[in-house]
């Protein structure tokens, strides 16, 4: 009996000794693990520094240089906005409202270089303009034509707000395909409010106009253009800014460089999406009618001359389905003025095909 008790006591003492020996090591390893994890998190902060460094050198400040009658003809330099270097040849994309009616333009780069710039072309409808500088070794913004902006994407707005110096603000893509806004021309031409904007909550202030909206890889997403400042009840909305998508911006830029202006086809209608049609407004018993409802026809315009009427439902344009107002009007803009196209419409219960000769969009 005493022998058994003695053996149990010895075994207990050995186990206790082992536990006492390894417990400090266990405590040390646990502490090391948590400390290592903490250090690792602190060593790798979330940052867009590399992306900004990739894009920011291509974002320039746009100034006007004017002689002052009040200061004996001395030259005054005034900030107009921002711009983006799009080509090594010196083409800079900015907003039309930034450089409109300015006689002398000066472009200032991030590296301190300053150049005079000349206007290549402007487009009021998209609020875009191309200016050119004669310079070498220019930083050019990165463009990825295969990448599409999606709602929720993180974006960075780069510009020079209030002439404070180059500034970066961060937000997300809040919406795509925004139309209307301040660029509506109200002409009933089908172009009023047709521009396809990106909406973002990244701050876009005076001086940011014409600057770059980039993604977290430093790739150009859009050209910053305006902030929504029309609040109801006197309040000033916050976090609502807009940018022109890069695909539209580069397409317009190419036309401005080639022709000095954008030559657009014009059909002379104002349309709305054909949604919520009654069940009897169908091509057959099962398929819903898809198209664009003609809300207004410009008197003596191409559509009017071709026989289109208010209330017609546009089904196809030049052989392509009229899926949406924006897509259909984009198709029209790409048609060379003077071209006769076939237009399929539905009027009441009848479907018919008309020939419409596209004209050039009238400059306002």
Name each region found by the language model:
Residues 38, 87-167, 322-326, 331, ...:
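Conserved active-site neighborhood of the chymotrypsin/trypsin-like protease fold
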Residues 69-72, 76-77, 102-104, 138, ...:
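Active-site loop architecture of trypsin-fold serine endopeptidases
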Residues 67, 88, 103, 122-126, ...:
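Short, conserved beta-turn/loop elements at beta-strand boundaries and strand-helix junctions
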Residues 57-63, 83, 90, 94, ...:
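Terminal peptide-recognition signature
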Residues 22-73, 82, 88-91, 104, ...:
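N-terminal activation segment of mature serine protease catalytic domains
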